[in-house]
Curated annotation (Swiss-Prot):
<keyword id="KW-0489">Methyltransferase</keyword>
<keyword id="KW-0963">Cytoplasm</keyword>
<dbReference type="Pfam" id="PF01135">
    <property type="entry name" value="PCMT"/>
</dbReference>
<dbReference type="InterPro" id="IPR000682">
    <property type="entry name" value="PCMT"/>
</dbReference>
<feature type="active site">
    <location>
        <position position="70"/>
    </location>
</feature>
<dbReference type="InterPro" id="IPR029063">
    <property type="entry name" value="SAM-dependent_MTases_sf"/>
</dbReference>
<dbReference type="GO" id="GO:0030091">
    <property type="term" value="P:protein repair"/>
</dbReference>
<dbReference type="GO" id="GO:0032259">
    <property type="term" value="P:methylation"/>
</dbReference>
<comment type="function">
    <text>Catalyzes the methyl esterification of L-isoaspartyl residues in peptides and proteins that result from spontaneous decomposition of normal L-aspartyl and L-asparaginyl residues. It plays a role in the repair and/or degradation of damaged proteins.</text>
</comment>
<keyword id="KW-0949">S-adenosyl-L-methionine</keyword>
<dbReference type="GO" id="GO:0005737">
    <property type="term" value="C:cytoplasm"/>
</dbReference>
<dbReference type="GO" id="GO:0036211">
    <property type="term" value="P:protein modification process"/>
</dbReference>
<comment type="similarity">
    <text>Belongs to the methyltransferase superfamily. L-isoaspartyl/D-aspartyl protein methyltransferase family.</text>
</comment>
<dbReference type="GO" id="GO:0004719">
    <property type="term" value="F:protein-L-isoaspartate (D-aspartate) O-methyltransferase activity"/>
</dbReference>
<protein>
    <recommendedName>
        <fullName>Protein-L-isoaspartate O-methyltransferase</fullName>
        <ecNumber>2.1.1.77</ecNumber>
    </recommendedName>
</protein>
<keyword id="KW-0808">Transferase</keyword>
């Protein structure tokens, strides 16, 4: 991957990034830790060069293989919800995609474990995370429905594609006292769900309507 300018210029400059973060705050994102992480992570490095000029628009963008980098507001809100009970020590992300959500998490928590089913996306995400010198992310080519049992339990789990229902394996890998944030539902419209584990009980609440790509089984 050709070396790119993390600082950015013009439509990828720090000033443009700051304007996006200010807009996120105006739209209800309150956690200063999350806003700071979004300010620090160069989103333009996590999209193709042809889309760099749109990187700081508050919109999802295609990343290839029928996948997208999530809308910044959604990344911020899901991260904010994950951190609400306290900073988790270990977070599992299901759906690495571009690597951007993992990069934001890596600014905020000690360890990030991220699974991606599409090998070509995983390779590019690994290169991008190395380029921005975030080394506390461990990536795996695998089926998100199976989770990553070797490093379970996780204090936080964040799912960046939408299953029809919560995968049982992910609930089992959530630590007691941990929190899971995921979009649930069919193609086109889902609800963002927050799940808190209390022993063998799982408390759920719906937060907002969202639209994510579907979560698929297997790996390619």
């Amino acid at each position: 991957m050709r070396e790119r300018n993390a600082a950015g210029i013009g439509m990828t400059s720090q000033r443009t990034r700051d304007r996006l973060v200010d807009a996120l705050a105006a739209q209800g994102i309150q956690d200063e830790r999350v806003l700071s992480a979004m300010r620090e992570v160069p989103r333009h490095l996590f999209v193709d060069e042809a889309l760099e000029s749109r990187a700081y628009e508050n919109t999802p963008l295609p990343i290839g293989e029928g996948q997208t980098i999530s809308q910044p507001w959604v990344v911020a809100r899901m991260t904010e919800l994950l951190l609400e009970p306290g900073v988790p020590e270990r977070v599992l992300e299901v759906g690495t995609g571009s690597g951007y959500q993992a990069a934001v998490l890596a600014r905020l928590v000690p360890r990030v474990y991220s699974i991606e089913r599409i090998g070509s996306l995983l390779r590019r995400a690994r290169e991008r995370l190395q380029a921005v010198r975030l080394f506390n992310c461990q990536l795996r080519h695998g089926d998100g429905y199976e989770g990553w049992p070797e490093y379970a339990p996780y204090d936080g789990i964040i799912v960046t594609a939408a299953p029809d229902a919560l995968p049982e394996a992910l609930l089992e890998q959530l630590a007691d006292g941990g929190r899971l944030v995921a979009p649930i539902g069919g193609a086109g419209y889902q609800e963002l769900l927050v799940v808190d584990r209390r022993g063998d009980a799982y408390e759920q609440r719906r937060v907002a309507g969202v639209s994510f790509v579907p979560m698929l089984e297997g790996r390619v």
